[in-house]
Amino acid sequence: MKQSNLLNAQFARRLFRTAFSSWQLLAVMLIVCMNVAVGSKLYAQSNTIAVKGKVMADGEPVIGATVLVKGVSTGTATDMDGNFSLNVASKAVLVVSSIGYETQEVPVNGRQFINVVLKSDVVTLKDVVVVGYGVQKKVNLTGAVSSVSTDELEGKPISNVLEAMQGTTPGLVIQQGSSTPGSVPSINIRGLNTMNNNDPLVIIDGIEGSLGNLNPADIEQISILKDASSTAIYGSRASNGVVLVTTKKGKAGKVEISYDFMYGVQQPTSLPKIADSWVYAELYNEAAVNSGRAAKFTPEQIAQFRNGGPNVNWVKELYHRNSPQSSHNVSMTGGNDQLSYMASLGYMDQNSMFKGPDYGYKRYNARLNVSHKVTNNFTLNLTSQFARNDIKEHAYWTEWIIEQANRMPPIYPIKNEDGSYNYPAGSNSNGLQRLEEGGYRQNVNDELLGTIQAEWEVYKGLKLIGSAGGRVWNNNLHENRKAFEGTGDSENKLTEQFYRSKNITTNLMVTYNTKIGKHSIGGLLGYAYEGFSEKQFSTSRLTEDSKYDIFVGDLSGDKVSNGGSASDWAIYSGFARATYNYDEKYLLEFNIRNDYSSYFAKGNRSGVFPSFSAGWRISEEKFWSVLKPYVPSLKIRGSWGLVGNNRIGAYQYMQTVSVKNGISFGDKLAQTAEFASTNPDLKWETTRMANIGFELGLLNNDLNITFDCFNNRTKDILVNLPVPGLFGNGAPIQNAGKVETRGWELSVSYRLKTGPVVHNFTGNISDSFNEVIDTRGTEIIGGSDVQTIIKEGYPLYSYYAYRSDGFFQNEEECQKGPHLEGITPKPGDIRYLDKNGDGVIKPDDDRFIVGNDFPRYTFGFTYGLEYKGFDFSMMWQGVGKRNKWMRGESVEAFHNNNEGPVMDFHQDRWTPNNPDATYPRLTMGAESANNAAKSDFWIQDAKYLRLKNAQIGYTFPQQWMKKLYVKNLRIFASVQNPLTFTKMKGGWDPEYTGDGSGRSYPVARVYSFGLNVKF
């Protein structure tokens, strides 16, 4: 399909070209300045002397402190006793630094022995947190911001960073519904605020990016911005929260090389629990008789199944027992006080658990981050990343393959005695053959992301900062699908697809920070532009011969399908921030942003998003001095503000046309045009956020507690309300909804040192609940097999179904009880509540709101132990309340008149001798109509507790490694997802996020080992 903008949004493209030119100019400036500066810095001094010294802090030697000669790359590091030696010029200046301490410059002045005493770096110890367009000390934060420690990422056999973040932060809801190679878990912050996209904004080094392509080993810090105070600076796309990622930077000192390696094997955490073949045969006979049919299996056949006959779990046969996974990461950092760098390479190889030729996911990462201090007040920074992910999979649909395998009875072998694939009577599918011989689909994605930043300190405290960056994403898809005779796939298919997107971002900011007595004042004023463009083309061809894996020939005809699209948008913004604190006790902050977006028509393009927050560090008051030994820190804070959401399709306020091949004349296809519904009055969704919280430190701040409660209300939600059929087109989008989301968060951390043993404990729990406030009185019902409703007074996307009321126990109950329209129930069938009391169960009259699948009471806790080089940690994560509507062959015996499946829980079915069963009487075909109705009987309790990761490691003593010229060496063993506790029936994973059919690639359990080494 080709989409064109009839009104030609020229201003978006004009701004895009202007910003791109600015980006090119800054790139040239960076290259010139770096070359001039590097070339001009020549170090030449005479009178070289040998200097020895010792670096101390708090009466103890500082191990590994960096000692550099100012202005050059000459340097060393202190040994186990804090000693160093260096040949320097007699008039040189030494720059001594170490993490957690203030950097000191020490003139040599001809001395041959120098003692250096480092002072604690107060800012470092009090923790700096990355926020929008800057950093702040954590103690002075007035917004709801959480940080994910990089310790959470280490030693875990993960394919993307989101898997490691799950359960680490309150209010951060991550669901890993599948471990499909290359897939990324879903992410949400503080629940659902809208009927549209609820994904948070992800910013990587100042550029919008993807967490799925990021190498976890490159990450320095992750900040989760959750309230208006912290997100309003991002304005129109911040209503769902913001994830800020800062990657590692270079540091002055000797070159340090790090290498990380991990190897593991994957196994499915859970698979459908299919009944054994002899049990299946017995229950099949019972279902057939209950349905007025003859029994199929004789007692002799059943005995044969029991005594060594076929007993095959077709779903299990789709997967390898063990599938390898490995990763390699190498990085190099170094530099001096003027230029520092960090370069890294990463490789991830995740084989598919599916059987088949060479399926899996490969990711290649390369990064270069450079910081160059051109002069004392002018600095240039470069961050750059290249990522390629290569996904190779089967050419069909995973849902289809799993569906057909799940429906296959265990009485049939998956292969015949001659090795050919078995197609039992009535079946047109063998999932294993589709995997092994059905062709392949390959997606190759390339991402190039980079930022150039120039920072000029015009005057003490006054800085001018300019940056430009971009992201280019290319996707190339190639598919060669092979047909199988008699399976319904009689023709081979070749597909080629290309997609490219470009994103350009520029920022210009002025910042000012000063301190006057006890008054600390800060300000920021900025301008930002972002432009995006994309285009896509695809073509498919049906062929008679599958041996050719290239796309050649005529591109038109009834066996060829072509399509394409293109779009672009732009947004430019002004923003400001003002901060004030008095003696670090009374804290104030104000943010505002004005966005101007091409998503909306003139007159509606501007959106203004302010926020205000305040905090009070009660523990810094004089009257608190008596309590200070018991409660050393206490802060209360609150915030209020507005943020926006413009995540709708482009051009929806304009009249657009779609052109496609719609009518066939002989062997030629004629093009047809479709005009979309429009609404020129569209405007921003706006979310009002309110938050109040406190932070409490006890036991000398070894025990820290943080609590927040919040209330968000979104108005003018962009939604397609139903329209009458006479309208003649799809419903136009309009601002017609309101949703309120309420919730709370609690996190606790505790550090305990008992002799040589250090214990670390962290835990968090949170909840959010949303309620639809207004849809103009309209109910929006969606879904087919699983139906949901958007209705005033209830959560978004609530399940909408009949409410079950046990089973009919006898004929009298069947005659007197309510029944589905047109169906006469029998004893053992599900009985439904008659909502309006007319005796007939009908969709329009008798459905209830019966649950919701969004997770509530999400929690996570970790325990870590360190003892003389040994370390152990475990991380648990779970959900306290969630419903999951399972359907089809995932729960129904003999679903849709198929031969299977029969699950383990079907054995506890209703019979006259088992009236208190958990499953209705067994039936098949038309006799199943009553029980197969959409009701809460099929909704399961999906709360769970899962051990996400456990690992044990050992770090070798430095005195051992020093002889091998190794700075640090750690070896470890780890397991991901080893244990799950859940009430879900049938072996289905409680994190499953699909449509309820169970047709999903499983979550993986991974056993691994690895090492971390630094030189």
Residue spans for each PLM region:
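Short, small/polar-rich motifs associated with maturation and membrane association
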Residues: M1-R367, T379-N381, L449, W684, ...
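Surface-exposed loop/interface segments of Gram-negative outer-membrane beta-barrel transport/assembly proteins
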Residues: V139, A252-V312, S352-E447, S467-Y572, ...
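Short secondary-structure subsegments characteristic of cysteine-rich extracellular domains
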Residues: D358-H372, R605, F609-G615, K967-P978
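Conserved C-terminal beta-signal and adjacent last beta-strands/turns
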Residues: S331, N760, N852-G880, A932-F981, ...
